[in-house]
Every structure is written in structure tokens, then in C-alpha cells.
Amino acid sequence: LFFGLLFFFTFTYLRQMIGVGIAGLSFKFIYERKLWKFVIVVLIAASFHNSALILLPVYFIPIKKYSIGAIMVLMILCLLIGVSGASSSLFEAYSSTSGLEERTTQYLEDTSGFRVAYLLEAVFFLWIILANYSKIGKDKQQIVLLNVALTFCAILLLFIRSENGGRLGWYFVLALIGTLTVVLSTSLKNVLNKLIVYAVVVFLYVRIVLGCGVLLTP
């Protein structure tokens, strides 16, 4: 489903999708603690689309599993910031240093109110991850992918009032896929979890085809 969605977007947001693919190669350098290789890969991704620079702070997230309580506090804080509209200042700061004032203004003006879809998406993924938190290993690779996946949810909540907020989260999707693969490979043994996940899969498939099929037209 994720790759299918990215396939649709490739026809409309080609440069950014290329950047997303390249940025995904940078995750291994986080848990290998190779800063310069990480930066180089992110900069290459940014050469296709400047928004890839949002990945740079991820390297400095400590490689450890945080408590569920700490994660919930962070997510609530991100939601409050997003609802307040204060996150738009991030776009403004980026604008002043990148010379993209006109494009950034378009991002800021593209606020269509509270994005319920972002909230539902973030809550659903958080529920799956946190409900199966103990199943996620403690090796560096899984922890890094976990933290990047949680960052994906945080980004959705931070930019919950922006139509373009979801696009910033694309750079974290590959880590989310990796984390969900680990979680669902064990949790699907539970019948209830299996029914819920399959129901969501069918719903998202229909939503993607009906909602994004138009993006097949350049």
C-alpha cells in the first residue's frame, strides 16, 4: 500500500519521490554512526527536492527505546503545536535561509484547517507500534527505524493544519514500513489484530485508488 501510494505520487511529485528514495539510503548511516555519509546522502536527496533537509535532525536523536509515557507526551506536545499553527514558523525559518520565500509562502497559505486524516493516520500507527512495543528488538537498527517511524507520526501532528504537511512525512515512510513489518509479523497471530489490519488495508486501498488515481495524469 505504501509503495502503491508512492507510485501514484511519482507521476505528480517526481523530484520529491526521487529524493525520498535516495533519503531512505541514509538510515543505515544513523545506526552505524557515520555522520558525514549520512549528510552526503541527505544532501544528494535535497538536490532533487529541498524538503529532504528535514531528515538532518534525525541523526541526533539518541539511539534508545523511549518509554511509552515519554512518547505520548511528545506526541501530545506536537499536536498542540500543530493545532496552534506555530509550526508554520519552521517554514518561515527555512524560507529565510534558502531563498525560497515565494514557494514557502505558498506552503504557508495552503492551510485548510484541521486535517482529520493526519490525526487518524498518526493515531493508528501509534496504536499499532505502542500496543506491540515489547516486540520491537533492542538492536540499533530496529531502534533507529522505530524512532524514525515515530518521527513520521510527530511530523503529521506538527503540520496537522497544513495540506502539505503529509509530504514532509514521506521521507520517514521507509522506516515506518520497516517497523510495521517487525510488529505485524508477530501481532497478526492475534485474530483481532489481523481483522483490524486487513480491514484498514482494504479501506486504504480503496481510498488510494479513488483519491489518488487522478495523480496518474502528469
Language-model region placement:
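Transmembrane and membrane-interface helices of multi-pass
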Residues: 1-5
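Short acidic/glycine- and proline-prone juxtamembrane loop motifs at membrane-interface regions
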Residues: 11-17
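Membrane-interface transmembrane helices that cradle and orient dolichyl/undecaprenyl
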Residues: 23-36
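Transmembrane-embedded, aromatic-rich helix segments that form part
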Residues: 38-41, 51-61
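Alpha-helical transmembrane segments and terminal signal-anchor/GPI-anchor hydrophobic tails
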Residues: 56-168, 214-216
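Transmembrane helical bundles and short interhelical boundary loops of multi-pass, membrane-embedded
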Residues: 148, 163, 175, 195-218
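Hydrophobic/aromatic-rich transmembrane helices and adjacent perimembrane loops
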Residues: 166-182
